[in-house]
Amino acid sequence: MMKHPFSNNHIINGNNNNNNLINGKVGIFWNLFETPLPIQQYSISHILNQLKFYANSLGYIKQFTIISDISNAGNSVTPSTYNIIKQEISQFGGIQYFEIFQSDRSELVSKIWEFIFDNYHEVSNGLHIILVDRFANDSPIIKPLTMRGIKISTLVSPVPTFHNQNQNNNNQNNNQNNNNNNNNNNNNNNNNNNNNNNNSQNNNNNQNNNNNHINHINQNINNVSNETHSFFSENINYSLNPYSDDLSYNGNGCNLNGNNNNNNNNNNNNNNSNSNSNIVIVTQMSSPILSHHNQNNQNNLSGLHFNSLSSYGNNSNPINNGQQSQIHHNINKLNLNNPPPPSNPLTSGLSYSPLQSPNSQSLANSSANISSNALNQSSSSQQQQPQSTSQQQQQQHKMNSSSGNISPPLPLSISLGLCRGGSSNISPLPSPSLSSSSSGSALSPATLTLIMPSTFQSGSSITPKNLSPLSSSAPNTPKQFASLSSSSSPSSSTSSSSNSLLNNGVLSHSLSSLLSLSQPPTQQQQIQQLHIQQLQQQQQQQQQQQQQQQQQQQQQQQQQQQHHHHQQQQQQSPPQNQKNNQQNQNQNQNQNQNQNQNQNQNQNQNQNQNQNQNQNQNQNQNQNQNQNQNQQNQHQQNQPNNIKFPSNFNDNTTLQNLYTVIQGLKEDGFKPTFKVILPRLGAMMGMRVHRSHFEKILEKAKTHSFNIDYTTKTIYYKDDNFGGADPHKAEKCHFTEEEIQELVDLIETTQIKVFPSRYNMVMWVTSQNLPLISKLKQGQIVELCQITINENIVSLDENLKKTTTTTEPQNNNNNNNNNNNNNNNNNNNNNNNNNNNNNNNNNKNK
């Protein structure tokens, strides 16, 4: 079964069948704000697509549930980003989104159990659950699910971490390419200066010195060999430097010693180095793509196994041409029919990081052993080869240094050796991972790097015609390998050196090195990178100095031009200068006055704003203080008064809440039934308690001295069976005839026989302060009221709720209208009085 590339734990039960992958149903449950959520790097739709891609590899997606804990959302994101996340999830479609206010994960567990109960008949076909939570590995739900044959995958983070590393590597490569482009642009700018010839010569000399220094570093690194213990019993030979002189071929299509190179200068070699750059083909393949490619090529590559490759290395008889020895591939014998069984994380207790497999340490050791053995083999083969000329060495050093990105060899690279004979055919071996048809498990992501030869002749080209049959179709028998090797090399007498190379296996590779992830750089590679970085820094410093010189020259020219312009202005007539000066002074004075006025206005505005801000702050502080006081008062009211919890569950808050609810029912006179306890317990916990969660609480209560009776559906603590009134089972035998008669007499005297609800009736009865009923507890009063309802003495009518609410605003409106009319009458009277006063004044005047 495929393992998620960024999963922390993968629990598998049962056999590894492809039917489960096709017919099985998958449920995804993501605790949103209990996992790292890098919104700045990835979008929500990208993360959801990653999870769906992983779930599709396990089976058919039946349910996708996301639970959002709003209490943790405030610590993770702002309200605006939370709304954006919520909107993107709703636009994605097909996702159940739930918002909760508690972080106890009870909602998540209940949703998982609901999914299992709905799809429990699919366990035989395969039922898989993906749990995304930072504490997913410690979830108590893992054990009961695996015991029932249900598969579960736990993901600590929904985002793959290796993508970040690939992006960082790509960014580094892009930065290096940009630096190279900037260097070329700076060189072109320097050519425009007066000292173009001198600068170009200095740059070429510096580049030659740097290239020689880099080649000297490569030679020192090739002389170093570090031997470490390999994961496999046999030694694996591997070349650390694919650009060394051992790979300089003298074939028809691969000749390093060109005819024109002997007559060229060092500068021409540097300028033409781009045409002879190394060809590096890097293919990054993820596990689903690689497995799909494997299934398509099973018919063509079914017979290619490591046993046939090893027999090819032992049975074939290559022929030496007398000039140089040949390099062949020899691959160790590995058995792919019986892969090791996967480890169970439940039994072993080991967890691996998203980028580290259990065999990563051993593979790192094997890669180190590859490098040391390859150096020893190459040193022994160089003693049998003729010494190259000085021109070939210089050309090889310049070819290595001319590449734009000089990077150390990767641990997952396969050096494809070319024939040194008379033919120019290229015969790369196919990847062993594509030829294995017996392994059922999918492959983890790996980086396969094919390093081709660094140089070719100008007339040679890589076409399908030049490739050997190995590149187009894989051979099925060792005889075809032998025929290929005999056809590619001319017939001549064999030597003891070629046989020893084949028997010892000069270049051998293992399947595990192809499947392992990228290893960290070795000390040799780090040294080489440091030297290359120092050289690049030196080049940048030189270019910066040249740029500074150019800037200084430009500044001098500008100063000279300004000086000439100033002299011309001074040569003007004195009257014009005086007029211009006066005008400028007047303008400056006006501008200063305007600026002062604007500053005064701004200061006044700032003062007003500061005063308003201070007032608002004082108001906010007062409001916050009032809110805090109200919250404290509410908290004190909600806290149970003088309740001492037993010592056996002091640390368990749920059991404490259950104990307080039972004690409260005891004081109110209610019988502690499931129906009465469940809503009150939810109010105490501040959440809605589901039935499945309540059953778990009951299981814990059994182990902490709570007596639970499923026949009567009651809960008591130890032997404190205080009884209590049950409104759902109201009976007359629980009360005396005098108490019942007192309530009936009250109803008959008041003539109130219809109530909106039982709650309103209970409140009305308690407010009457009857002598016998006032001595009863609240639960008993509720049961007594229920008896009158059952005996049809009193009836309930919910329509009264609507009438009481609608009549109140009508009465208010009538009162308002009356008040308005009275005000109008008063105004009219005032107007009349004013008119009378005016008439009296007029008469007096007459």
From Swiss-Prot:
Biased composition, class Low complexity, residue ranges? 163-217, 355-414, 483-501, 568-642, 811-846
The cross-references to InterPro entries, in alphabetical order and at most eight, read: Sip5/DA2
Disordered: annotated segments: 159-217, 254-276, 332-414, 459-501, 556-651, 803-846
| Biased amino acid composition, Polar residues | 459-482
Q: Which domain of life is it from?
A: Eukaryota
Name of the featured protein = Putative uncharacterized protein DDB_G0288537
Q: Which organism is it from?
A: Dictyostelium discoideum (Social amoeba)
